[in-house]
Amino acid sequence: ELSVFSTWAWQWSNEGDMLYTTLFLSTAEIKDEIRPHVLWQTKLDGKVSMKPVPVTNHVTGEKELFVQDDRHTVYLINDVGRVLWKLPLGQQINSEVYQVDLFKNGKLQYLFSTPDKMYLIDRNGNAAGRFPVAFKGKCEQGISVYDYDNNRNYRIFVPCENREVYLYGLDGKPVEGWNPQKTDKPVVSKVQHFRVADKDYIVFADRYRFYILDRKGKERVRVSSVFDLKPHTDVYLTRKGGQPVLVFAGKGGQVHVVNFSGQTETSRVEGLSDRFEMNIVDWDGNGNGDVLFTDGNRVLVTRLDGTPLFEKKMEAKTLGFPYVYRFSAKDVRVGLTDPEQNQLFLLSADGKLSKGFP
């Protein structure tokens, strides 16, 4: 019974074509112990090729898993590991899998994209509405979906290689009134929406420039600085000195901080390869963002100005993206994977591995 545990979390992992779900449990009596327990495993037709996505069954309220394999087949798996349906797509999903309410009746669908199309699938595995919708150019960054006012009037951003950023509604049609200028280069980040001080900001980057627009596609904040960004750049909203800022990484270990007046600061973390992964975490609980890196078998944390806070070499070959799990206000842990050795790590801020890991 879950009620006896003070903290619990789910983790999904895979080994080849096997998908596992694990439950981590922490009791008040054993505060520093998080116990992993494999609940079920399911065999797929191919190797898992994306991080499994927990989705809600709108009929029962239970959690299910949406996942894709390397044969480009997607699956919906219920809470005991049974495959409810599978659907071949022909391409790899490159966006998040969003649950949306097309008919505003409480019944949810799955919205996602591949480089050539976006799909809307109901919980029975059937296409919904006017979907799939073919893009006007390759969309390598994937779609982003936002419900500005929580009224189920969804907006779907589609950044394409033709330097256009398109905006669609859930009816599969372009939204009238959205008219941004072409970017200088193809977009290298997902399009993101942030609301700061009751203002909306549409944010994305190309190889050298950073764009901050309003909901109509007009420039809201001018960022004059020039950057050198990676092909897939993540942008984070966090705080520095108590003020909201946007943070993203460039090549050569550069960390760029942009405030909402368009001013920029850049620091450099020495010794990083161009294969590093980055996330944002409040490492020391002071209310400001810190930068969390994985690079090879190393985990590093620095302040936004580059001041080092933490570094540890793991017994791993190559660490993947560092996921942040907050079990309580003072208990932040980093979830790490080593795909080459099929290992999972859960690391606390004091550098210790949680019991049962890897």
Which ranges hold each PLM region?
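Extracytoplasmic/lumenal domain signature
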Residues: 7-16, 21-358
